[in-house]
Each structure stands twice: as structure tokens, then as C-alpha cells.
Amino acid sequence: MTFGLLLASGAALADDMPTIKLLMKEGRLHPEMLEVPAMTRFRLEVRNEGPGAAEFESLELKKELVLAPGVTRNLVFFPMKPGTYKFFDDFHPETGQGRIVAK
């Protein structure tokens, strides 16, 4: 019973997280700048609408996510200090540059 309560409380906490959306399409990121609340856990929903694979990667934040065409996946970020954090599409490094700004 305790395990069930832990699962239920974890699901409730996940539902309370803000969700930020990022679209990856044809080597471009939309939007290129994501503003997130500082010191708040959040979910990043990443969707690849391009014809080929895309990869969300941030060396600073130690996050990496490969997406096949048409796939949507989520990453959960722990609270971040105020600042700017770079990320990129590893398959399109020239055009797929973005940043997360925690305020």
C-alpha cells in the first residue's frame, strides 16, 4: 500500500510541473530561446517534425535525447539557477542552436 501511495504522489508531482515545448524541424529549433522559471523543476516536451532524426543535446546540463521523425518525448529538468544554458541539435549543429534562460 505504501508503494502505491508513493507512485500516486509522484504522478501528482509530475502533473504540477510546468511544461515547456520545443519543436525541432529541418535543422531548426522553434523557439530558439526557452524561458523557464529558475529554481523550479520543469518538463521539456521535444517534438521532431522534420524528415530525419534530431537530437536535443546540452553539454552544460548533461542532457541528450535522440528523436526519430514524428516522435515527441519528454525530459525532466531539476531546478536550475538563474542563467543561460546552451543546447543544440547534434545532427544540425550549424542551424540548430538554442538556449534555455532560467529567470
Question: Over which residues does each language-model region extend?
Answer:
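Sec-dependent signal peptide recognition
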Residues: 1-3
